[in-house]
Swiss-Prot record:
<dbReference type="InterPro" id="IPR011332">
    <property type="entry name" value="Ribosomal_zn-bd"/>
</dbReference>
<dbReference type="GO" id="GO:0003735">
    <property type="term" value="F:structural constituent of ribosome"/>
</dbReference>
<keyword id="KW-0689">Ribosomal protein</keyword>
<dbReference type="InterPro" id="IPR044958">
    <property type="entry name" value="Ribosomal_bL32_plant/cyanobact"/>
</dbReference>
<keyword id="KW-0934">Plastid</keyword>
<keyword id="KW-0687">Ribonucleoprotein</keyword>
<protein>
    <recommendedName>
        <fullName>Large ribosomal subunit protein bL32c</fullName>
    </recommendedName>
</protein>
<comment type="similarity">
    <text>Belongs to the bacterial ribosomal protein bL32 family.</text>
</comment>
<dbReference type="InterPro" id="IPR002677">
    <property type="entry name" value="Ribosomal_bL32"/>
</dbReference>
<dbReference type="Pfam" id="PF01783">
    <property type="entry name" value="Ribosomal_L32p"/>
</dbReference>
<keyword id="KW-0150">Chloroplast</keyword>
<dbReference type="GO" id="GO:0006412">
    <property type="term" value="P:translation"/>
</dbReference>
<dbReference type="GO" id="GO:0009507">
    <property type="term" value="C:chloroplast"/>
</dbReference>
<dbReference type="GO" id="GO:0015934">
    <property type="term" value="C:large ribosomal subunit"/>
</dbReference>
Amino acid sequence: MAVPKKRTSKSKTKIRKTTWKKEACESAIKAFSLAKSILSQRSKSFYYSKKNIILPSSFESQSKEEE
C-alpha cells in the first residue's frame, strides 16, 4: 500500500529558497557588472569585437566626433 511522504518543513523550504535567490542575485550582479564594463570599454579580462558591440547613443556621438 502506498504511504504518503512526510511534508517538508517551512524552515527547510525557506532555507532552500533563500540559497537559490542568493545564487541568482550573485549571478545577476556579475552579469550586470560585466555588461557595464563592456559598455564603458574598460574590460581587460577578455577580447571583443568593436564592430559587433552595441553602444549607447552617448558613445556613438563621441565616436563620430573623433572621426
